[in-house]
Amino acid sequence: MTKQDTTDKLWGGRFTEATDAFVERFTASVDFDRRMYHHDIRGSIAHATMLAKVGVLTEEERDQIINGLREIEAEIEAGAFEWSVKLEDVHMNIEARLTQKIGITGKKLHTGRSRNDQVATDIRLYLRDEVDVIAAELLRLIAALADLAEREADAIMPGFTHLQTAQPVTFGHHMLAWAEMLKRDFSRLADCRERFNVSPLGAAALAGTTYSIDRQYTSELLGFNGPAENSLDAVSDRDFAIEFCSFASLLMMHLSRFSEELVLWTSAQFNFINLPDRFCTGSSIMPQKKNPDVPELIRGKSGRVSGHLISLLMLMKSQPLAYNKDNQEDKEPLFDAIDTVKGCLKAYGDMMPAVSVNRDAMAESARRGFSTATDLADYLVRKGLPFRDAHEVVGKAVALGVSSGRDLSEMSLEELREFSADIEVDVFEVLTLEGSVNARNHIGGTAPEQVRAAVVRTREWLKRNTEM
């Protein structure tokens, strides 16, 4: 491992005694913030390039710094870099190593910069890269749901309210409901990215710097939309972390609801779908078990992400301007939320294309639950009955079905006419599952024709949003 001198703090000139050993460990963040090494180095290269442009560094000094930073990045990626708790964080570790490698020139890098604007820049760069990965995974899952919806556009299942059979719907329509939620999540993520893509670099500690820096130039080098307008806000703002975790919490809430349905549907009591074996596990004692661990775990992980949102809100509550050490606590919840969301989206993006559907079980479940009762009421309304009277008539017919163990479609015309003389032989056209779903043939409806049209619109949306 590459050694570096850690006997003196880079900020130690004002102090007369060494940091307490426990406090040194307690206040260090290098164990978790070193994942931002690439972004820290990228920000430093941009800063050094700008310092040379404005005449603070010579071109030779700039090149020394940039080459040294790239060598350090290679050391880190090769596992040859020794991280030190004594140096507190990713920034000081890299700067100390740079000075060790290139000498006094390395000490010039931090000119016109503070760790306050440095870390704010690093986090935004890191989050931006991760958001782009998450966006791609989100689009992949939406595409998988659209493919599944197209494949099962005419597969009939019971729709539920209160988890009780309500009306027949198509499986494709149900999948597109989840796709709509994820499309809203994507929109929130894109909005979040646009808002946080501003550069804090150059804000320094809190008030800006006395050097004639070019913040617009570093902003462009780093791919930001522009420099942050206010130096105080630039170094103290963590809205972007909160906003990301808000997006993540909503997304995970949606995935949790989706997971609950997958868990139910794989059970013997529903038997609507089958998950591939490679996404399930068995029991250590019960040989017959095939457990839907992936959706169960994703359902459980939603809570930790919501917890991270609350943690960040409470972290920032009551903080005065500008930077406070409290803000070191922003990274672990943010990083874990990022990791959790990426993992969950990848798992479902891989799994959903391989889900198989048990059409017979779904249709039978829809038939058992009197799911066409509303269709019979609508039929009577079209015959001239007020809806409330039709509702009463059908309720009595359902009661007979419950007591006799039959669906409405299994009753004879004579039996049905005992409840209303307006019922005629054409009633059986509306009492079939197919007739029920096909009748809802409008935008947003469950008819197979509408499902296929919605799939086309979803794919057009995907095409428009392949790049944020």
From Swiss-Prot:
PROSITE patterns: FUMARATE_LYASES. The keyword Ion transport does not apply. One of its GO terms (cellular component) is cytosol. Pfam families: ASL_C2, Lyase_1. InterPro entries: Arg_succ_lyase_C, Argininosuccinate_lyase, Fumarase/histidase_N, Fumarate_lyase_CS, Fumarate_lyase_fam, Fumarate_lyase_N, L-Aspartase-like. HAMAP family: Arg_succ_lyase. This is Argininosuccinate lyase. The gene is argH.
